[in-house]
Design a protein with these regions (language model features):
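Bacterial N-terminal signal peptides that target proteins for export
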Residues: 1-7
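A beta-rich soluble binding module of mature secreted/lumenal proteins
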Residues: 18-171
Length: 171
């Protein structure tokens, strides 16, 4: 009986760690073009999370992998250790490749949701959320974005149930 309980607990942890869903009442962008999304993005705002705690000047670089997936290189400055921290991961489409819903992993078989829910026509600004409303990033091709545009993206997030008070701004 004890072995069965441990197995069930580990299975639940595994499934919880592999959540790639989109938060309720939110849809990823359609007519998504990965080739236009590839390249460097800068984190302008985020809901803080355990894997980015204490980091600033965060950037993400996306490139194609040989297996058709996306190589993800995240980099951020730790003021505590006074050095750059880098994480390398991989991402794959959850649905069709023209929908902005991907799953991303930085650790073995564990995937999380990477859902692009707002993206400008020129692929310069992006609003990305995870599997629930505890994960949110506003990304820009440059380290800053016009304040009125940032406000538009933050209002969009707020109108979809994200707590604006939890969002850190880095510009």
């Amino acid at each position: 009986m004890r072995v069965k309980s441990i197995f069930m607990f580990l299975s639940m942890l595994l499934l919880n760690g592999c959540s790639v869903k989109v938060p309720k009442d939110i849809s990823p962008v359609e007519k998504f073009d990965l080739s236009r999304y590839l390249g460097e993005w800068h984190e302008v705002a985020r809901i803080d999370n355990r894997f980015e705690k204490g980091l600033s000047k965060v950037s993400a670089n996306y490139s194609l992998r040989d297996d058709g997936g996306v190589k993800v290189v995240n980099r951020g400055w730790s003021s505590e250790s006074k050095k750059w921290k880098e994480s390398i991961g991989k991402a794959y489409f959850v649905e069709s490749s023209d929908t902005g819903a991907l799953k991303v992993s930085f650790f073995g078989p564990f995937y999380g949701g990477y859902n692009i829910i707002k993206l400008d026509d020129n692929y310069q600004y992006s609003l990305v959320v995870g599997p629930n409303k505890d994960y949110l990033w506003v990304l820009s091709r440059t380290p800053t974005m016009p304040p009125e545009l940032l406000n538009e993206y933050l209002s969009f997030a707020s109108n979809h149930g994200f707590d604006r008070q939890r969002i850190l701004i880095f510009q």
